[in-house]
Structures are given as C-alpha cells and as structure tokens.
Amino acid sequence: MRLNTLSPAAGSKHAPKRVGRGIGSGLGKTGGRGHKGQKSRSGGKVRPGFEGGQMPLKQRLPKFGFTSRKSLVSAEVRVAELAKVTGDVVDLNSLKAANVITKNIENVKIVLSGEINKAVTVKGLRVTKGAKAAIEAAGGKIEE
C-alpha cells in the first residue's frame, strides 16, 4: 500500500446532486426551488427574524435592564482553586500568575466551593462568610 494508491471504500462517498441539469436528474428545470416567488430567485432570502411584515417578536417585547460593565472585570474564585496558587499568599497577582483568573480581572471574590487543605493568607480580596470560615479552619488568615 502506498499513499498515492489510497482511495475511499466503494460506496462510502456520494457525488453531490447537480441541480438544474435536465429532467432525468430529478432536479432539472426549477432545481428543487418550486415556481416563482422570492425564495426561487438567486439571493432571495429573508433576513433572520423577519416575520413577513408583522411586528417581530423581538420588537413586541419590552426592553429590559442592561449588561453591567463591572462583570467584565469581576470574577468569583472557589476556595478549592486556591490550591493552584504557589506560595502561601493569595492576592490578585498570584491568582493571575496561577491562571486562575484572566489578566483583565480587577475585582475578585472568594466563595465557598470545595475544600482547602493548605493554610493561605488572603490579601486584598473580598471573601464570603463561608469561605472565610473554611480558610481560617485550614489555618489561614484574611488580610485587607
């Protein structure tokens, strides 16, 4: 066997249907598009969300709220993820160095999820009550 002699197994490949190539093909004349109308023409399609002229659902529903820009620079870190940080001090830069958070994050809150086994010192990060209890139970401490 050589690379230049390889070919797919017999019957595993189907030739694409050639549209508009005679009556005998089964897809001649109109080519499966029916007769007349917008969708029979080339480039004839309606934009997504168009409902034939009636007021679209997107416009019938009221506007609601907004997307907070603060969410783009804020993150929650689980207690279990603190184990990924090398060293005993956990702060914004050490979390970024350990790839726990992305580089554009400015505000971090540590939440209770999972377990922590090593004693760490948390500096300059917000911490929930449950996470604070878990960190202190493991021998760590929280510094502002």
Curated annotation (Swiss-Prot):
Native source species: Vibrio vulnificus (strain YJ016)
Record's subunit section: Part of the 50S ribosomal subunit.
A molecular function GO annotation: rRNA binding
GO BP: translation
Lineage of source species: Bacteria, Pseudomonadati, Pseudomonadota, Gammaproteobacteria, Vibrionales
Extent of Basic residues compositional bias: 32-44
The protein, known as: Large ribosomal subunit protein uL15
Described purpose of this protein according to its UniProt entry: Binds to the 23S rRNA.
InterPro entries: Ribosomal_uL15, Ribosomal_uL15/eL18, Ribosomal_uL15/eL18_sf, Ribosomal_uL15_bac-type, Ribosomal_uL15_CS
Similarity annotation: Belongs to the universal ribosomal protein uL15 family.
Keyword Phosphoprotein among UniProt keywords: no
Region (Disordered): 1-57
A cellular component term, taken from the record's GO annotations: cytosolic large ribosomal subunit
Amino acid composition bias (Gly residues), ranges on this chain: 21-31
Keywords annotated in UniProt: Ribonucleoprotein, Ribosomal protein, RNA-binding, rRNA-binding
Superkingdom per UniProt: Bacteria
